[in-house]
């Protein structure tokens, strides 16, 4: 059985020529049968790619030939199914969109905490633990005792941080803060923001939830549930074993068994989370895309229009 290697990586580094990097990088990926998304901006690179191991490693080697990316770190995972069906290299203002000018993780960032030391940190009652991910991600799993900002995008986090009572007690004393996200990139910016706002004791989970699940055995873990990932696996658990969630191809939210059993679920068209907010014309269009995808699947072809990729990947490697 063919297996696909997924590699996730990011690096904050000055890339003033980022637009010129796009075409040769796309050519390299296509030549090596690698699919996924690479985001490029003046502040760095952020990506999740997948394909045959030799192809993925060839792309990583190509990137590391640039002296600015020579120390690029990546995470690996295996999948029996193709996580992505297209290769996209996109030029962006930010490699993870927060929308706050002047925040540079290369200048100031929170203190990295290794997975082995994370339990002790978040077990401290004086530490405010914040899950920086979107609400649909938090909904299927998080750390015990973590605060959920209940946001729909990472760009909403700065406003929440400015108003969160736990961060602005009546005493005026700024608390210790521990932040986490899927792979680490969102915390690079969120901890940098808090440091810029005068919070001195700010920490974040090195390597994110994925590194924690890979490193910490279940019997020692404070993680509850599954971790949402932005590829065909949808969710993973301890040991990065693929979880039991499916993905609504209409709204791109994770679905559990109860969602799939709901009369509001129609494959590729709607689910209990989006049925009421989509119009009939949207459902009709989705129904036709699903039909085309099923025809292509029956012919053992790839139908790009109904591929399993998320429409947007707000934080590819940093999820």
Curated annotation (Swiss-Prot):
SUPFAM superfamilies per UniProt: Rhodanese/Cell cycle control phosphatase (SSF52821)
Known EC number: 1.14.-.-
Pfam families from the UniProt entry: Rhodanese, UPF0176_N
Gene Ontology MF terms: oxidoreductase activity, acting on paired donors, with incorporation or reduction of molecular oxygen
Superkingdom classification of source: Bacteria
Keywords assigned: Oxidoreductase, tRNA processing
UniProt signal peptide: none
Region spans: Disordered: 298-319
Family annotation (SMART domains): RHOD
Biological-process GO terms, alphabetical: tRNA modification
Its biological purpose: Catalyzes oxygen-dependent 5-hydroxyuridine (ho5U) modification at position 34 in tRNAs.
Name of the protein this chain belongs to: tRNA uridine(34) hydroxylase
Organism: Albidiferax ferrireducens (strain ATCC BAA-621 / DSM 15236 / T118) (Rhodoferax ferrireducens)
This protein's encoding gene: trhO
